[in-house]
Swiss-Prot record:
Lineage: Eukaryota, Metazoa, Chordata, Craniata, Vertebrata
EC number(s) recorded for this UniProt protein: 3.1.4.-, 3.1.13.4
Name of the featured protein: 2',5'-phosphodiesterase 12
Catalytic reactions on record: Exonucleolytic cleavage of poly(A) to 5'-AMP
Compartment(s) where it occurs, according to its Swiss-Prot or TrEMBL record: Mitochondrion matrix
Amino acid sequence: MWRLPGRAALRGVRSVVEQRSPAEATTHEAVRAMERAVVRCVPSEPKLSLSFALADGSHKNMQRDQSEPLGRALSRIATNALKGHAKVAAAKKSRKNRAHSSGGAACAATGSEPAATCEPVVKLYYREEAVAEDVLNVDAWQDGAVLQIGDVKYKVERNPPAFTELQLPRYIMAGFPVCPKLGLEFGDPASSVFRWYKEVKPGAAEPGDSGLASSSHSLQSSAWIETGVDERVYTPCNADIGLRLKLHCTPGNGQRFGPSRELESVCPVEAGPGTCTFDHRHLYTKKVTEDSFIRTVSYNILADTYAQTEFSRTVLYPYCAPYALELDYRQNLIQKELTGYNADLICLQEVDRAVFSDSLVPALEAFGLEGVFRIKQHEGLATFYRKSKFRLLSQHDISFQEALKSDPLHKELLEKLALNPLAQEKVLQRSSVLQISVLQSTTDSSKKICVANTHLYWHPKGGYIRLIQMAAALVHIRHVSCDLYPGIPVIFCGDFNSTPSTGMYHFVINGSVPEDHEDWASNGEEERCGMSLTHCFKLKSACGEPAYTNYVGGFHGCLDYIFIDLNALEVEQVIPLPSHEEVTTHQALPSVSHPSDHIALVCDLKWK
């Protein structure tokens, strides 16, 4: 009878190098051929789960208290097995009776009825010894144990890699990467196995080699053939148009694999829009940069919460085809555009929470980037960084209104603002936020960088509000880059809603703004809150001052910037923006070939 060994015994077991005799090897192979009984047991949860298939084909999922004695769990398994056997027997009897009835013969008793089936013997073995029934579940269900139900044996797998979530996008287009959304427990995507299939065209002859996976009975169908792609991401080609896709995947952790799963796309692959505004830009970004460079992207991707309003469809973007404003369509373009830049840093604005988790994370993670998110109200900011180049050290996000009201760092600024209560009220009503991530180089630990990302207040008459927000942002960035991490350089990305002629831009580039600047009265004299502002940074717009980064029917102008610290960084190259002809092919942005009303800024920076 197996019971929990003492600590000394456990140390002894761990110290012995396992060597299998021929008999043990045979036993090991037999165990490998067994059915699986999957146990999920997490210390932070009161219950464990047990999943296995009975001989009748039914699948059982049980939840048992971790602190429960094993005997109770085994008794419950026996009851379930008996019920399953009874159902099978009843089904057989029903079929037999129907067969007799159809032949016109009565079902006469030829003897006594068979005796009622007894509960099968259910035992749990570990190292070929039966586990005592008073051992608690948490200790009894060990990896490698054997569960026996009647004559059937199951290999117990405790906490194997498993998918907790697996989804394909609803809208799939030829030429655009398909990135499944994955939720993994006890595993990682890099150690998992993926295999893509596509439907056989209706009426097409099945190839001589179907290419179907022999390890999965569910794939033994002539309706599917292999695509030849065994990676997490699949990009359909024009030949796939009209066909659905299937993904077969097995979760792994580098040491073992868990139960496989498969899923099919809801809709067939559709034709893409042809040439997109970013296709030519991708010619400059075919490869990831070397370690001494930082390819940086700043992009307002247009939140779905704004794109789907009646005002957007009829007033802001009436020239845009309605289907091209739908998220299912736009996210294909966004994913392809962003992944094609092979960026090291990506700062995004107007990111819906669901878009971050369901679309951006799966797509960019598959290409080696990891992201953090900061919500504003209905949407927020996202910063992604290449994991092979950077690790995240800390985050220092703030809400401007909360920081102004409660953080001593902004006491002086708030006192100046309070001299005009009306202006103060307007500023403190705004929900704008600042996202700050401190990153460290994975190849040189002495290199750290402060990456800031923001989206300032949008209203055309909100110039003074943007000045206050920028002043608060630079004070907070100074605290992070000078006080918390002395001397680290700054990259400040965002949609600043300010053209190069505004006070905000003047303040950032020149280091100061006078109290008589016209933007202090941007919403009239009654809200004038003139003050002299300065900051200590030496900043430059890495992409210069393009004619526009936002192009809609009623406005175009430069609103987006990547500001860099000239003391530590320099610009290696700026990826050219789309030509004016490309931008206006469909009148303005967004369009069927461009997913946002803004244009991404992309540049390669270099450490000095």
